[in-house]
Amino acid sequence: MLIDSASMYFRAFYGVPDSVTAPNGMPVNAVRGFTDMIATLITRYRPDRFVACLDNDWRPAFRVELLPSYKAHRVLRATPQGQPDVEEIPDLLTPQVPVLLAVLKAAGLASLGVDGFEADDVIATLAARADAAGDQVDVVSGDRDLIGVVTDRVRLLYTGRGIAKLEELTPDAVQAKYGIPCQYYPDFAVLRGDPSDGLPGVPGIGEKTASIAVSKFGPIEDILALAQTGDPAMSPTIRTKVLAAADYLAVAPAVVRGRTDLTVADLDDSLPRSDADPEMLDALGREFGLASSIERLRTAIASIA
């Protein structure tokens, strides 16, 4: 199981009231919600391996260089070149992130981030490796761009309606919902646009036309090539719109697609048989008022051991 950590702790932060606090008054709603989500996922899906994937860089320079609008609306403060920009995050969430990562570590659950890359890239790399090895993989995220990693062995558990109502996206489910092969979802998103990521899309091409174009012609590179050669299979209307957006289409696929070629450190991602640091886990429970959530996590892990 590969989880998109930021996607989940943002959902936890907004889903659990900030009246949930530690004894010292610090809000711990995101920590509690995140921990409870993981316990629920482990209990329901019973993974034998688990990695919490991290955004070491939420807006990587290589993507911004290709498409400056990428996530630009979420920048709180630009930083010197070579350092990640500061993301606009709720003030009450920021101090909770180290706590939830400490809970993972003390429980013995693996986490992984790669400098210069997003969690999506870590997930895409680990999912591709596991798929090639013949392993079944569940990816947990509220980011639909990760539909692009779905295969016969890799399933996306989409959290858009919450953990209690996960949407299980397989190749057949993606085809039924969007009318496209799952590997072409990033191309579909490039054409349609995605304001949440700063993708403008191609003017005049909406979801229906994007679905038709991708299902008929394949990835963006093929669509652009057909438009440039004047292939009669493509309607003049679509050709005109594609050619008008040629500069955008030449770079956007590399922005949206998750990287599958990251160099990642070896890690023990097996579900732990016992707490890695039981004293620390107990201390976190006392300090932050998380004893009940930590006990649920322990119970979930023990049920698999």
Question: Where are the language model's segments positioned?
Answer:
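Noncatalytic, basic helical substrate-engagement surface that gates or grips nucleic-acid strands
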Residues: 1-140, 144, 148-164, 170, ...
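Non-catalytic nucleic-acid-binding/docking modules located in mid-to-C-terminal regions
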Residues: 46-51, 109, 151-153, 166-305
